[in-house]
Each structure stands twice: as C-alpha cells, then as structure tokens.
Amino acid sequence: MKPVIALVGRPNVGKSTLFNRMTRSRDALVADLPGLTRDRHYGEGRIGDRPFIAIDTGGFEPVVKEGIVAEMAKQTRQAVVEADVVIFIVDGRLGLAPQDRAIADYLRKTGRRVMLAVNKAEGMKYTSVAADFYELGMGDPYAISAAHGDGVRELVDEALELAVQERPELAEEDADSGKGVKIAIVGRPNVGKSTLVNTLIGEERVIAFDMPGTTRDAIYVEFERGGKPYTLIDTAGLRRRGKVFEAIEKFSVVKTLQSIADANVVILLLDAQQDISDQDAHIAGFIVESGRALVVGVNKWDGLDGHTRDRIKHDLERKLQFLSFANFHFVSARERTGIGALMRSVDDAYAAAMVKLPTPQLTRVLQEAVEFQQPKRAGVSRPKLRYAHQGGSNPPIIVIHGNALSSVSETYRRYLENRYRAAFKLKGTPLRIEFRTNKNPYADSKD
C-alpha cells in the first residue's frame, strides 16, 4: 500500500507548486476528474524506492458555508479523510492569516497527523520564517520553497515516516497479500463490478479479509478457476453479506490507484448501456501510466441490438485508441456470458507482462524492422539502431542501443513497438521502449 499525503492550505500558498514538485517523476497530474477540477487532484510520486500518493486540494476556507468555496472545502475535508498525513501549507512571505488559524483549528479536530510547511521561505532566516507560525500549535514548522525545491525532500521524507508510524502495514511488502494472479476490477460506479466479482467466485470457497484501518484499505478475495489460483482486489467498496458481495458504490481515486498498483492484471469494466465517459478515460489513463497488464470488459452486452452494438464498438475504437494493446471482451456479468474468454485474456495478459525476451531475438527483430523501414534523418545524420535487450518486465521494457537515437521520432518508436508486439505476441500489456545512445569514442579526438 502507498502512503497518502494531502496538501491543505488557504488559496495561493503554493499547494499546486508543491504537488507538481512532489510528483515530478510521474508527470505530476494523474487524475483530474470531472467535478473535482477545483478541489482534488491526485498524483503519484517517489522518494528513493518509496512511492506515495499526493492529493492537491483547492484553497481551503472551512468557515464558508455556501457557494463554490464551500464545495471546495467539502472536497478538502474528504482529502483529509483519505490521507495518512496532512501537510498544512502557509505563506512565509505574507505571514500568519486568519484563515490559517481556522484551518489549524479544523485540522486539530480531525485527529490526523499534520505537518506545518512554511512555503516561499527562500532567502529568509528560519527563525524569522517560523516565528509567526508557532502559535498555530502544529509543532516545528518546516521551511520550504516549493518553487525551487528547497527543503521539499526532507519534508516528504518526514511525512512518509509519520505515515508508517500511523499505519505500520504501509511498511510491509504487498507481495504476500493474496495467491496467484492478482486482479483489480476497476471502473466507475454501477458498471457491474460487484456482479462480476460474484460471477467469478461462483460457489468456490472464498477467503475474504479486511486489512486493518479505514475504508481506503483493500479487500482481497482468493478463489480458483479452472484449477488456477487468483486473488481479486476490491476497488468498489465491496462488503460481504452472506455469500454475496454487495458494492457500496462510491468511486475512490485513492482506492483505485492503490489497487492498480497492487495488481498483476487490471480488468477495466465499462457499461455498454452508457456512453464512454471522461471518467472511464481517466481510469484507463491510470492503468496505462502504471504499466499494468490490462483487459477491457464491456458489461451489460446482453439484450442490445446489432445497430447499438456496432455503435458502441465504433465509440470504443475512437475514444480508447490508446488501449489498442488490450483485448476487449463484450460480456454480461449477470448472465455469465463471455466470462471464460475474459479470464483467458487475463492469463494471456499476465504472461505477456512477465515474458522473458532473449537478446538475440530482440536484436534480430530490430534489424528486420530497420531493414524494412529506416528511421528518418535528423539534419545530417540518420539514427543508427544497433542492438536491443530487455530492461525489465511488468511491463516489458526493451532497451535499444545505437547512435543519434535522441532524434528517433515518436512515429518510429510506435512502429518498433508494433513490430515487437507482433513478433512476440505481446497482447494485453503496455510495452516500453527506451533508446540509449552509445558514446562515440572518437568524438573528442582530433584529425
């Protein structure tokens, strides 16, 4: 599980700047969901080998009772509930403001671990920066500059330590949570996730457990299908009632991110009776960004006429082009149709994500691809692609060595990706291609 850090403060104290600084390794913004654009943004970051989730909130004015500011305050309160640690940001240049006192009063009542960060402190002495803010009763302030990065790593390091103190299970490895292929079923509310869970587990013996803590902790459901062990990771807020799991359908970005990170394969479930939404596309973006193997299930397919089915397939091709590496299955979780093929694709996607690719074959495919179509020249030189080897798995990473590779176009990179996918039958997994330019040993020599 990844620690969750919420950034809270009044307007214009630098929360978004700090958010972007913290999440730079993952291109900052991971989620910007409809209805949340003025309040909560979610991103993934990493300090060394420790990943975390950051939540950027809108300007917080807890005493306002109506209007858009009140709605922003509501969303900020939700971020605090989701967080393991709250970083309360104030403005060192402007000093202590009445809104800061109101926010501090609110945060004290929540019982959350809170760190006080005095932003915009570059060029200022710590004693003068911190003096105003001790009266908030939030402990020793951390002087930082989100814009320049000063003090940010130390701040996040301490936040992660506090998170582990709050929830010791955060320090544990996720690898032991569940047997077999770990599957996360994700999607917006009411697409049929709980029905699919019940269909998959059938009458098999189920071991379900709640990890200690709050609603943002996961449920793992172990089951067998065709003699193979699997573990389902809940993202829908499933709770067991008798032998049936029912969904408390409230979409949680944090739970979705956590479950995707913990999974081997993700099933993205869509509703055939509703148009593809921005939220569907955002969830798909989470999965691609994470590098997880993917199978797409289009649920509630039963009862649709041929014209409607053709229209839906056209919309899927148009709106989810970036998921072309995945298998799409048209299923009915309620009627239990198409589930066998869906699970076969889960197995295939897992195998593709974990595949071992020998260097000689990788290099041969590269040479054949270049022979068929060379990369375009960039100025006076043409990129020279020499050899390839595997740089990692889950997702597979292919590292290509050569000269002048910085000028290889995105179009040519996609061409190579397609050649490798076809050669090794890599269906269902993202594929990363990295270019490494060899140093020219004669670059510094003179004629």
UniProtKB/Swiss-Prot annotation:
Belongs to the TRAFAC class TrmE-Era-EngA-EngB-Septin-like GTPase superfamily. EngA (Der) GTPase family. This is GTPase Der. Residues 3-167, 181-354 form the EngA-type G domain. GTP 2 binds at residues 187-194, 234-238, 299-302. The keyword Secreted does not apply. Gene3D superfamilies: 3.30.300.20, P-loop containing nucleotide triphosphate hydrolases. PROSITE patterns: G_ENGA (PS51712). Residues 355-439 form the KH-like domain. GTP 1 binds at residues 9-16, 56-60, 119-122. CDD domains: EngA1, EngA2. It comes from Cupriavidus pinatubonensis (strain JMP 134 / LMG 1197) (Cupriavidus necator (strain JMP 134)). Keywords: GTP-binding, Nucleotide-binding, Repeat, Ribosome biogenesis. The lineage of its organism: Bacteria, Pseudomonadati, Pseudomonadota, Betaproteobacteria, Burkholderiales. One of its GO terms (molecular function) is ribosome binding. GTPase that plays an essential role in the late steps of ribosome biogenesis. Coiled coil: none annotated. InterPro entries: AAA+_ATPase, G_ENGA, GTP-bd, GTPase_Der, KH_dom-like, KH_dom-like_a/b, P-loop_NTPase, Small_GTP-bd. PANTHER family: GTPASE DER. Associates with the 50S ribosomal subunit. GO terms for biological process: ribosome biogenesis.
